[in-house]
Amino acid sequence: REFKAKLVGTDAKTDVAVLKIEATGLPTVAWADSDKLEVGEFVLAVGNPFGLTQTVTLGIVSALGRAAGIAEYEDFIQTDAAINPGNSGGALVNVRGELVGINTAIYSQSGGNMGIGFAVPSNMAHSIMEQLVQHGKVVRGWLGVSIQELTPELSSQFGVPKDVKGVLVSDIMDDSPAKKSGFERGDVIVEYDGKPMDSPAHLRNAVAQTVVGKKVTVKLIREKKPKSIELTIAEQPKNLSQAAAEDSGESIAPAGLLADIEVREVNSELAGRYGLKSSDHGVVVVRVKAGSQAEEAGVREGDLVLEVNRKSVGTIKSYEHVAANLPKDQAVLLLLKRQGRAIYLTLRP
């Protein structure tokens, strides 16, 4: 049977759309709770690969909470059930025939199945569907922080026990709920609204799915001490692009771990070269020695240096002063700004 469909709404950030057809008496699929899905559980992928209609393949859940870099909000179910071109939008169901996900993408070097497929979890898809049906668009919650993975090196720098999982706050946006409630750079978020947070993707998705106006409690670690902050979630701005000093011409590369990083004070020429904003003041990386520890750690030409070992370095002189007083044989913590985002990196001796 064929029906004419009307597009109710789309959400490009999750690759989910809702269509409406005029029909009655059609069977419907039951929704499963994807949060209860476990690695190793059997699943079936339904779709039309290569135009072969009503094809079903069997596999298992290979992993949960995957981020594949193909959508802005990702919490993919990874499966080895054969997913090929034409499966996108098809159902991923459990052995009871309940919907656990929507097939979205494959990882392939040949264009065909290689045993790695991804599906949007049913809980995320259901939340998106409800908003598209009710409002024709998706309204996402907003905390207003830049976050990154808490690596073992960063855990050590911020005094977080190795067995504690969390998400590191690298920056706070102006006029955001986080700013108004007292978040600080270097905070490590361990729990959001009663749920433990173990990755940036996990926290990003949790905040986005929070109802605007809801009060939530965020538990974090600051300066090695636990802390709780209560705040009200705001609506995510439409444009989330992260919301002039005189130059002496001097370029420096101090000794020690910073010896392989050459910096200069920002001027109009450097700002234009590296795409910095007129409001960006401080020192910018103009060279990183190839094959050095700094390059291996992720320092790049054009990075704006905001802090060294949590001390602000807004000028060449302040950078030199901090660099000259770094303790020997100890890791150095850098706070950099790259393409509008603040990130922490660790240089190890």
State each model region's role:
Residues 12-15, 85, 340-341:
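Short acidic/glycine-enriched loop/turn segments that link adjacent beta-strands
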